[in-house]
Amino acid sequence: MRRLFTSESVTEGHPDKMCDQISDAILDAILTKDPNARVACETCTTTGLVMVMGEISTNCYVDIPKVVRETVREIGYDRAKYGFDCDTCSVMTTIDEQSADIAMGVDEALESKKGQKDEVEAVGAGDQGMMFGFATNETDAYMPLPIYMAHKLSRRLTEVRKDGTLDYLRPDGKTQVTVEYENNKPKRIDTIVISTQHGEEVSLEKIEKDIKEYVINAVVPTELLDSETRYFINPTGRFVVGGPQGDSGLTGRKIIVDTYGGYGRHGGGAFSGKDSTKVDRSAAYAARWVAKNLVAAGIADKLEIQLAYAIGVAKPVSIEIETFGTGKMPEDKIVEIVENVFDLRPGAIIRDLDLRKPIFKQTAAYGHFGRTDLDLPWERLNKIEEIKKYI
């Protein structure tokens, strides 16, 4: 059976991704000084303006406007002709403390209030909700090929801009990859779409030629391309106005780019700007950790796990496994393995994945999962042998 599946990525200069990076840069700056801080930091941006808002409870001081400007500078918006200037943009902040009603459930979980006293039980989930984790063995990164290749292309777009290879490129950009599957195995790349912001002086013909040579051919394996592969490079013909000048940006608006490109399900909660007591983030990371280790252990070729939590309660209210017909054992047995091998209470997730550290800004562009360029705790294959004891 033949089918097509498409996923997209965006560069760090995309306005939504700018906001994700600013929110996580602020989170990291706070965690560096106060690892136990509670942070829920949202950012929005438009022409000449960055606004930071949210709820932050901490005992430290962070110069938020300075963090904002440094982050925007690193992305590459450092002069007016790019449509946004880190030195002259306006930065507004409006920050409150975390609600006392929420804090009381996170500070002491329901289990702890009922007498189950230990350090892990003391941390309740920061909200209700469901989170999904996914892994597949179709790539070495245990990620679906469409999102994996889309991220590689968007990262390469930024590399050739920053190292001067294509110095006419600007920070904003998007990529999209359509993969043809045959019998549920990736066979070839059917379509590649790349839209990149550029200087006014360069022709579309040069952009098309350079993007194929320095971006696509540099990262896409030749065996995945053929004479039928279609390329759409800046298909509107012009992309000079970009970044916050072209579109407003908002934290948490690229949640599918952040995860599995639509190949796996998503619970709806965004990651950036949230400390690890927020299960939207920490439990989604744990779910990826579980799924990746299960697939690497040979439990299934493709696996998705759903976790669900109640606010103020430590233990998940449900765990569900889907193997899409690739499992080597019944799914209820896999759930038992998960319960025996992984402690999925928020306090245990924070402990086992070391999530009090300021490691989040680096995840805020090019995906939180399958990052072979980073050493992220939830990507480590450190539970395989323990899982195999139950097979």
From Swiss-Prot:
Pathway: Amino-acid biosynthesis; S-adenosyl-L-methionine biosynthesis; S-adenosyl-L-methionine from L-methionine: step 1/1. CDD domains: S-AdoMet_synt. Keywords: ATP-binding, Cytoplasm, Magnesium, Metal-binding, Nucleotide-binding, One-carbon metabolism, Potassium, Transferase. GO terms for cellular component: cytoplasm. K(+) binds at residue 42. Its EC number is 2.5.1.6. L-methionine binds at residues 55, 98, 247, 278. Homotetramer; dimer of dimers. HAMAP family: S_AdoMet_synth1. Belongs to the AdoMet synthase family. Catalyzes the formation of S-adenosylmethionine (AdoMet) from methionine and ATP. The overall synthetic reaction is composed of two sequential steps, AdoMet formation and the subsequent tripolyphosphate hydrolysis which occurs prior to release of AdoMet from the enzyme. This is S-adenosylmethionine synthase. It comes from Clostridium botulinum (strain Eklund 17B / Type B).
